[in-house]
C-alpha cells in the first residue's frame, strides 16, 4: 500500500510539473479581476486554469507525501531551499495582514504564499526520496516548457490576427472597446500561457538552459545518437529562443546579456585578452542598445518607473519598519509618492524583497532576500558537476536578476519552478543516506506538521476559490464573453442576486460592488450605483477610481460642486492620473450624458 501511495503521489507531482507552465502561469495577486473557470472539458483543455488551484494541488501533494514518503531532514539536499521558500516565506507574509486595509489583498497574499509553500515542500519531500522523481519531474517540466514555446509561436503567427478579427466583429456588433484596451490587445508581444509578455520572458530565462540540456538528452533514445541529439538541440533552440525575442522584453534581454557576461568572465580557462576584448565589445553593445532604447518607443520610461517603485518602497519601509504598511497598500501609497509623469499605477514594487519589506516589514524583506540568495549559493561551486546542473543554476541566476525588476513572484509556475530546479539540482541523495536515520519523534512531528499545513492550505484555497467562482459568475452576467449573450443581458434582479452571493463569500470586498455599480451606471440607475460605490468606499477608502465614479454620478445628476469635490479627492490620491484633471473629466462627462435621459 505504501509503495502504491508513493507511486501515485510521485506521478501526480510529475503531472503537476508538466502542467505548471501550461496551466498555472497566469498572474496571481490581483483580486480586482476574477479567475476564468473552464465551463467544460474542451474549455479546460484550451485555457489556463485559476492559479489558486495550485493550493489544492499543493495541499493534496503535501499530505500524500507526509503519509507515504519518509520524512527528509532540513540538512538534506534542497532542504535549505525548502525551508526558506516552503516555510519561512509563508510565515514572513503574515505580518502584512496587520496594517492591510484591503481584506482581499490580505487574503490573496496568504493564499498565494502558503499554496506555493505547500507545493514546494511536497516537491522537496518527494525529491529527497531518490533521484528517480527528480529526473521525471525535470523532464515533465521541459515538456511543458516546450509547449509554451509552441504556443508562443502560434500566438506570433496567428494569435494577433485573431485578436484583430475579434475587435472588428465587436465593433460591427456595436460593442464599445476602450482605446487603452485596444492598444494592449493589438500590442504584438508574445506571452504564451503566462500572465504577460514580461513574465513569460522571465520564465524562459529560468527554464531555457535546463530544458535545452534535457531535450538534447532525449535524442539519446534514437539512433544514430549524434544526429538525433543535434536535431533535438536544434528543435529546442528553434522553439524556445525566438519566443524570448518575440516578448520584446528589454529587461529580459538585458538580464540574459548580463548573466552570460558573468558566466564568461568567471571561466578560469578563458585567456585574459579575450575577456578584455569581450568586455570592450559588451560596453559598446550596451551603449548602442541604450541609444536605440532612448530613440524608440517608451524609451527609458519603464526603467525610471521601476526606480520610482523602489523609492516609494523605501519610504514605506521607514513609515512601518516592523510590520509593513500591509498587503495591497503599495498601490495607494505609491500613487501619492510617485515622481514620474505617467499614469501607471503599480500594485507591487516589481521586486520581491522590496515588496515584502514595504508591505510586511523589513524582517520579512530580509527573509525574502535570504531566500533569493539561497538559490544562488551553489552557483560558483562544484564546477565538475553535470552540464544540466550548471545550466539550471545559471538559468536560476538570470531569472532572479530579472525578478529584481519584474513581478515574477506573482506567477505560481515561475516561483515553484525556480525553487524546484534548485532542489532537484542539489547534490544527490547519497549524502542523506550516509547520515543516520531521523528519530521517530522527528518523523512524527514532521508528518503532523505537514498534514496540518496541508489541511490549512486546502481549506484556505477552497474558501478563496469559492469566492472567485462567485465573482466570475457576476462578471459573466455583466460582461458576457460571447456576442449572443451580450444582446441578451441578465436582468437587474439576477445581477443583485449574484452580487449578494459574492458578498457572502467575499465579505468587505470592494470589487464586486464596483463592477455592479458600473453596470447600474450604464443602465441609468444612478442612485443605486451611488449606494454601491459608497459601500465600496467604506471598505477601502484610498481608491481614487471610486471617487472618480462618484464624481461621474454627481456630474450626471447635475451636482457640479459634488463632482468637483470627489474629483479633488481622486486627484489627491493619484495626482499623476490625467483622468483626474477637471478638463479631461468633464469632457468625458459630456460624452456620457448623451447615453442617459436625466
Segments predicted by a language model, with ranges:
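Alpha-helical transmembrane segments of multi-pass inner-membrane proteins
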Residues: 7-24, 52-69, 85-99, 108-125, ...
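TM-adjacent membrane-interface loops and short helices in multi-pass inner/ER membrane proteins
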Residues: 160, 164, 196, 307-346, ...
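Short extracytoplasmic/periplasmic juxtamembrane "stem" segments immediately C-terminal to an N-terminal membrane anchor
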Residues: 41, 172-176, 306-317, 472-495
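Membrane-interfacial, low-structure loops and terminal tails that flank and connect transmembrane helices
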Residues: 1-2, 71-78, 219-229, 431-443
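A juxtamembrane structural motif centered on a specific transmembrane helix
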Residues: 2, 384-385, 421-465
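Hydrophobic alpha-helical transmembrane segments in integral membrane proteins
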Residues: 291-307, 442-482
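C-terminal luminal/periplasmic domains and tails of membrane-associated envelope-modifying transferases
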Residues: 475-598
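Juxtamembrane membrane-water interface segments that cap and precede transmembrane helices
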Residues: 29-47, 99, 177-194, 304, ...
Amino acid at each position: 500500500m505504501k509503495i502504491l501511495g508513493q507511486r501515485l503521489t510521485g506521478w501526480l507531482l510529475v503531472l503537476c510539473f508538466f502542467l505548471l507552465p501550461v496551466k498555472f502561469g497566469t498572474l496571481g495577486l490581483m483580486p480586482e479581476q476574477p479567475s476564468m473557470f473552464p465551463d467544460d472539458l474542451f474549455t479546460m483543455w484550451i485555457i489556463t486554469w485559476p492559479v489558486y488551484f495550485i493550493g489544492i494541488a499543493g495541499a493534496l501533494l503535501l499530505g500524500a507525501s507526509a503519509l507515504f514518503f519518509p520524512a527528509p531532514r532540513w540538512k538534506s539536499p534542497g532542504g535549505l531551499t525548502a525551508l526558506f521558500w516552503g516555510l519561512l516565506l509563508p510565515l514572513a507574509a503574515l505580518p502584512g495582514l496587520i496594517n492591510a486595509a484591503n481584506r482581499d489583498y490580505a487574503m490573496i497574499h496568504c493564499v498565494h504564499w502558503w499554496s506555493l509553500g505547500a507545493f514546494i515542500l511536497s516537491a522537496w519531500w518527494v525529491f529527497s526520496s531518490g533521484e528517480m522523481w527528480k529526473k521525471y519531474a525535470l523532464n515533465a517540466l521541459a515538456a511543458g516548457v516546450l509547449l509554451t514555446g509552441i504556443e508562443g509561436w502560434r500566438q506570433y503567427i496567428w494569435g494577433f490576427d485573431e485578436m484583430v478579427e475579434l475587435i472588428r466583429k465587436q465593433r460591427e456588433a456595436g460593442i464599445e472597446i476602450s482605446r487603452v484596451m485596444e492598444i494592449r490587445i493589438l500590442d504584438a508581444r508574445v506571452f504564451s500561457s503566462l500572465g504577460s509578455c514580461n513574465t513569460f520572458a522571465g520564465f524562459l530565462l529560468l527554464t531555457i538552459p535546463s530544458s535545452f540540456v534535457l531535450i538534447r538528452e532525449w535524442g539519446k533514445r534514437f539512433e544514430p545518437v549524434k544526429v538525433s541529439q543535434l536535431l533535438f538541440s536544434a528543435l529546442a533552440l528553434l522553439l524556445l529562443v525566438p519566443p524570448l525575442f518575440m516578448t520584446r522584453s528589454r529587461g529580459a534581454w538585458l538580464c540574459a546579456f548580463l548573466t552570460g557576461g558573468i558566466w564568461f568572465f568567471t571561466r578560469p580557462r578563458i585567456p585574459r585578452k579575450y575577456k578584455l576584448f569581450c568586455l570592450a565589445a559588451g560596453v559598446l553593445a550596451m551603449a548602442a542598445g541604450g541609444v536605440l532604447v532612448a530613440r524608440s518607443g517608451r524609451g527609458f520610461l519603464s526603467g525610471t518607473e521601476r526606480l520610482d517603485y523602489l523609492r516609494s518602497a523605501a519610504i514605506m519601509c521607514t513609515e512601518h519598519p516592523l510590520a509593513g504598511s500591509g498587503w495591497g497598500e503599495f498601490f495607494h501609497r505609491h500613487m501619492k509618492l510617485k515622481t514620474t509623469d505617467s499614469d501607471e499605477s503599480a500594485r507591487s514594487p516589481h521586486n520581491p524583497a522590496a515588496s515584502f519589506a514595504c508591505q510586511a516589514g523589513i524582517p520579512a524583506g530580509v527573509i525574502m532576500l535570504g531566500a533569493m540568495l539561497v538559490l544562488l549559493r551553489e552557483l560558483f561551486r562544484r564546477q565538475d558537476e553535470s552540464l544540466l546542473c550548471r545550466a539550471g543554476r545559471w538559468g536560476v541566476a538570470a531569472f532572479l536578476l530579472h525578478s529584481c525588476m519584474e513581478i515574477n513572484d506573482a506567477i505560481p509556475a515561475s516561483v515553484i519552478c525556480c525553487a524546484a530546479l534548485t532542489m532537484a539540482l542539489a547534490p544527490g541523495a547519497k549524502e542523506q543516506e550516509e547520515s543516520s536515520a531521523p528519530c521517530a519523534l522527528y518523523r512524527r512531528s514532521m508528518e503532523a506538521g505537514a498534514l496540518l499545513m496541508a489541511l490549512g492550505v486546502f481549506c484556505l484555497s477552497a474558501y478563496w476559490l469559492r469566492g472567485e467562482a462567485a465573482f466570475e459568475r457576476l462578471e459573466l452576467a455583466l460582461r458576457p464573453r460571447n456576442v449572443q449573450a451580450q444582446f441578451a443581458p441578465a436582468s437587474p434582479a439576477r445581477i443583485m442576486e449574484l452580487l449578494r452571493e459574492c458578498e457572502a463569500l467575499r465579505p468587505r470586498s470592494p470589487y464586486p460592488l464596483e463592477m455592479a455599480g458600473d453596470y447600474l451606471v450604464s443602465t441609468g440607475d444612478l442612485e443605486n450605483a451611488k449606494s454601491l460605490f459608497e459601500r465600496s468606499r467604506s471598505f477601502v477608502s484610498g481608491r481614487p477610481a471610486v471617487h472618480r465614479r462618484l464624481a461621474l454620478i454627481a456630474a450626471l445628476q447635475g451636482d457640479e460642486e459634488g463632482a468637483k469635490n470627489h474629483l479633488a479627492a481622486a486627484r489627491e490620491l493619484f495626482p499623476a492620473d490625467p483622468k483626474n484633471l477637471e478638463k479631461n473629466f468633464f469632457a468625458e462627462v459630456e460624452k456620457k450624458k448623451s447615453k442617459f435621459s436625466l
